[in-house]
Amino acid sequence: MAKQEQRFDYVKIALASPERIRQWGERTLPNGQVVGEVTKPETINYRTLKPEMDGLFCEKIFGPAKDWECHCGKYKRVQHRGIVCERCGVEVTEPRVRRHRMGFIKLAAPVAHVWYLKGIPSYIAILLDMPLRDVEQIVYFNSYVVLNPDNHSELQYKQLLNEDQWMEIEDQIYAEESDLEGIEVGIGAEALQQLLQDLNLNEESEKLRQEIAESKGQKRAKLIKRLRVIDNFIGTESRPEWMVLNVIPVIPPDLRPMVQLDGGRFATSDLNDLYRRVINRNNRLARLQEILAPEIIVRNEKRMLQEAVDALIDNGRRGRTVVGANNRPLKSLSDIIEGKQGRFRQNLLGKRVDYSGRSVIVVGPNLKIHQCGLPREMAIELFQPFVIHRLIKNHSINNIKQAKKLIQKNDPLIWDVLEEVIEGHPVMLNRAPTLHRLGIQAFEPILVEGRAIQLHPLVCPAFNADFDGDQMAVHVPLSIEAQAEARMLMLASGNILSPATGQPIVTPSQDMVLGCYYLTAENPGAQKGAGRYFANLEDAIRAFEQGSVDLHAWVWVRFDGEVESEGESDEPESVVAADDGTVTKTYRFRRIRETEDGQRLSQYVKTAPGRILFNNTVQTALIH
C-alpha cells in the first residue's frame, strides 16, 4: 500500500471521549462481525504457543502473529493477502500491524482517571469545586454524595454522607407518610460522572467571571484557577465527564511483547500483568452484577476495579504499589512515558546515532586548543568505514571482510592507516546539556592511549565541563561538506568569544590560574640551592630538573636582555668597584657589571626556576 503523505501543523493532546477510544480499537470484518473488545485475560496457549482468541494477544483483534497466515492455518502464503478467514476471523496480512492495531476493554462500571484525580492540581476537584480529600472519599467508596437534595431540608447538593447518615435518610424516604421522592445519592466514580455531567461549562464560566470581578486575594486566585480549567475544556471541546473512563484502550501487543526464553519459560511486559488484573476484576464485577449479588460485594469489586485501572495507568500514584516477582514494582503506562528513561526523553528526543561514541573526559594540557585526545579503541570503531576504504584502495586488501579481520586482530598496519585517515578529519565533541551553540564544538583528533577523551582545559568554560567524572559524546561528520562546515564554523580555535555576551569565553581558570600562581609564587620554605649563579636560563632549568635547585629558590641568572621590574628603586643598593676598573651595581632584583665609562658588560637577574619556566612558556606561545 502506498504511503500517503499527510501534512500537519501541530500535534494536540486532548481528552478522548469513550466513543473515540472505541473507534481506535473497533473494526468491522467483511462478514459484519465487529471486533476489538478484549474480554479474556489469557495471553497465549501454553500448549500450542498461539494467542488465545479474545485475549490480550488475540489475532482477530490485533492481526496475525505469523506472516500471511491466519490463526487456524486455513490460509497461508501472500496470495491470500487481505482475506479474512471464515473459520477464525483473522485477516491475512503482515504481522507488523500488531504494532499499531489497538483494542479496548468495556468496563462494567465507570472508573476515575487517576491523572485527573490525583494529579497536581486535581482537575476533577477543581471542576467540582470540592476538596480533593472529599472527591477521593467518593471515588474509593468511603462516602456517599448528594446528587439531588430535592425538598429535603437538611441536604445540600454535593454534600458528603457517611453510611449511617445515608441509612437514616433511607429510613425517612421509605417511611409511609414520607413525601421525599426525588432524592438522589451516589457513590464511586458513577456519582462523580453524574456530577461532572451536570456541569454546564458556559454557565459556570460566566458565573466565575462575575465572581472574579467582585472578589480579591486568595479567593480571586482560586476562582481564576478554576476558570482557566473550564475555559480550556470549552476551548478543546472536551467534556468533563470524559475524565471518568467507561472504556479503556489496550495498546498494540507488539508494544508489550511476550517472548519465550531458552528454558521454555516466558518473559512478558509488566503491562500484560496490569491489563490481566483489570480484565479479571472487570469480568468478575460483570458476573456479580448479572447474578444480582449484594450491594456491599458489588461495591467492593468496583473499588478493586478502580484500583486495578489506577495501577495500569500510574502504578504507585495512589495506595499500595502493585509488585511482581522479586517485589519489583510493575511498570505502568505512565512509567513508560515519563522521566529520563521514558519514551520521550530516551527514545524520541535523545536517540542513539551511528558514528558516535561517549567517554569520560580528562585534562589534556599538552594539546593545542583545536585538538582533542581520542582513545585508539574508540577511533578505530568510529572511523572504521574510512579505514576499510583506505585499506582496500592502497594496501592490496581485496574485500571488506578481509579488512574487518585485520581490524579485529589489531594488525599494526591498521594504526598507520588510522593515523592517515584522521589527519585533517575533525570530530565534534558535545557535552549535555547543550545550552548554547558552544556546547558542541569541532576538534582535530589526536590518537591517545587509554579509554578517556582528552580535552584542552581552556575550552572547559564553553562546555561548562570539569574533570570530576563528566562525560562527553563524540560525533564524526561523514560527508566532505559536513567536515568543511565543522572546520570552518565549529573549530574550537574559532570560538573564542561568547555569542551571548561578546566577552572572551576561553579564559584560564581554576587549575591554570593555580599553576601560574604556584610557578611564580615566593616560598621562603623551599630555598634549596638559593644564591647560586647560572650562565643562562637553560642552565637554571637543568639544575632544577636535576633536583639541585628548588622551584622557588632565588638564584642569579645571566640575562642580557631588557628587564622590567616593578617596585625597584633606580638607585642601586650597593656599588662595588673592582681592581680592573669595572663597577658592580646591585639592585633589588638585578646585578649589573659596567666599565668605567658606563658600558654594560653583563647583567644577572634574581629570579626562581618557576618564574623562568613561566616566562619561557609565555614567550614560546607568543612566538608560535
From Swiss-Prot:
Write down the EC number. Answer: 2.7.7.6
Q: Which Pfam families match?
A: RNA_pol_Rpb1_1 (PF04997), RNA_pol_Rpb1_2 (PF00623), RNA_pol_Rpb1_3 (PF04983)
Keywords on record: DNA-directed RNA polymerase, Magnesium, Metal-binding, Nucleotidyltransferase, Transcription, Transferase, Zinc
Where do the annotations place Zn(2+) binding?
Answer: 70, 72, 85, 88
Q: Which GO terms describe its molecular function?
A: DNA binding; DNA-directed RNA polymerase activity; magnesium ion binding; zinc ion binding
| EC top class named in words | transferase
Tell me how the cofactor is bound: Binds 1 Mg(2+) ion per subunit.
Give the cofactors, semicolon-separated. Answer: Mg(2+); Zn(2+)
GO process annotations (BP)? DNA-templated transcription
Q: State the InterPro entries in the record.
A: DNA-dir_RpoC1_gamma, DNA-dir_RpoC_beta_prime, RNA_pol_asu, RNA_pol_N, RNA_pol_Rpb1_1, RNA_pol_Rpb1_3, RNA_pol_Rpb1_3_sf, RNA_pol_Rpb1_clamp_domain
One cellular component term (GO) for this entry is:
DNA-directed RNA polymerase complex
Catalytic activity of the protein: RNA(n) + a ribonucleoside 5'-triphosphate = RNA(n+1) + diphosphate
NCBIfam families (UniProt xref) = PRK02625.1 (NF002729), rpoC1_cyan (TIGR02387)
Q: Which HAMAP family match?
A: RNApol_bact_RpoC1
The family line of this record is: Belongs to the RNA polymerase beta' chain family. RpoC1 subfamily.
Subunit description: In cyanobacteria the RNAP catalytic core is composed of 2 alpha, 1 beta, 1 beta', 1 gamma and 1 omega subunit. When a sigma factor is associated with the core the holoenzyme is formed, which can initiate transcription.
**What is the role of the protein in this entry?**
DNA-dependent RNA polymerase catalyzes the transcription of DNA into RNA using the four ribonucleoside triphosphates as substrates.
Its name, as the record gives it, is DNA-directed RNA polymerase subunit gamma
Q: Which gene codes for it?
A: rpoC1
